[in-house]
Amino acid sequence: MTDAISICVDAVALPVTGVMMTNIAPSTSAPIARLTAGLLCLFTCAALILQSYISVGWTMRDGMGLADSLWRLTGYFTILTNSLIAISMGMIATSSKGPKVFPNHALAALTFYITTMGLIYHLLLSGGRNLSGLSLVGDLGVHYVVPALMLVWWFCFANKDEVKFGHAAIWLAWPLLYTSAALLRGRFENWYPYFFLDVDKYGLVQIGLNVLGLGLGFFIMGLAFVVLAKALNGLAAKPR
């Protein structure tokens, strides 16, 4: 799986490097931004369909019905965040405004969410998983390729002049909303999507500490992302 991840990273790094060497400023061409957003939307949808098909197959083999298996999918931060990317990119692709259909800080938030999701998955959840075939393709798609492509798209086409340090705190709203819903759902369904939210196994105190740690991690990552946005905006504003 490490080799496959390296291939994906190399495939994304090449176009990013090319952009950095040629033009650091985001493209102002709405048609190109809309076209690439549409392609990203289609790819994200394909990755979601494949990953959902695989996940539903696993749960149904364990005896769960189709409806319950589909419902369980909605409990994963990965599925929900990838869905946000697909919907947002679809809206950009179909709007005459292009990226301007969203505020600049909202596009930064979407990029922050999906890239942080990929990082958390890689650090906390990917270890010990021996995937192959379509399972590996689906896993790489939603956890690595979509985050990388979204980062590239944001880098190339989104303006970054509205991104402020205060947004790092505001951006905590989505992960906190998800965590609250996941804990509430787990209380009634006796199922938690991630081990670090499993109250039944680790108790409320430990899960509270886990949530605080993750929240702090999200906030620090948010600050780092704001610094990146400001740095890119400064480079784009420099006369050439």
Language-model region placement:
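Membrane-interface helix-boundary motifs at transmembrane edges
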Residues: S95-A106, N159-G166
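Membrane-interface transmembrane-helix boundary segments in multi-pass integral membrane proteins
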Residues: I32, G75, E189-A224
